[in-house]
């Protein structure tokens, strides 16, 4: 996840270049982007997650939290079982949160 974010940062910084290599140097806040014949050191704190539910070191929910995002995740907690997460369209049926996952599972009774 962090490397994906760094690739996005890298592409934003070097939009017309083919690629860059990302190196990890032990501390999550000390990543370096290595570009051919050019080295960019990211500022301290550049990798801190702006999301209140996400632990920037593990890329998982912070201690005591259930989820980071998803249709059945609100304020870092799973939404109650039975809450509609996808409304029915046409002959379709509603999909409901299970209370145990951030995803919106398909209704098992659908054709």
From Swiss-Prot:
It is found in: Secreted. Keywords: Cell adhesion impairing toxin, Disulfide bond, Hemostasis impairing toxin, Platelet aggregation inhibiting toxin, Secreted, Signal, Toxin. The keyword Signal applies. SUPFAM superfamilies: Blood coagulation inhibitor (disintegrin). One of its GO terms (cellular component) is extracellular region. Pfam families: Disintegrin. Disulfide bonds join 53-76, 67-73, 72-97, 85-104. GO terms for molecular function: toxin activity. Residues 1-20 form the signal peptide. Residues 47-111 form the Disintegrin domain. A motif (Cell attachment site) lies at residues 89-91. Residues 21-47 form a propeptide. Inhibits ADP-induced platelet aggregation in human platelet-rich plasma (IC(50) is 8 uM). Heterodimer; disulfide-linked. PANTHER family: ADAM A DISINTEGRIN AND METALLOPROTEASE DOMAIN, ADAM METALLOPROTEASE. Belongs to the disintegrin family. Dimeric disintegrin subfamily. This is Disintegrin DS-AS.
């Amino acid at each position: 996840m962090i490397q994906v974010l760094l690739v996005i940062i890298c592409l934003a910084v070097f939009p017309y270049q083919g690629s860059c290599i990302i190196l990890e140097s032990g501390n999550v806040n000390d990543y370096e982007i290595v570009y051919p014949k050019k080295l960019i050191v990211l500022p301290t704190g550049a990798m801190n997650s702006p999301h209140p539910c996400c632990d920037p070191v593990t890329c998982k929910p912070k201690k005591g939290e259930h989820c980071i995002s998803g249709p059945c995740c609100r304020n870092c907690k799973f939404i109650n079982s039975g809450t509609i997460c996808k409304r029915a369209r046409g002959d379709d049926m509603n999909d409901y949160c299970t209370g145990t996952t951030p995803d919106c599972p398909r209704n098992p009774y659908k054709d």
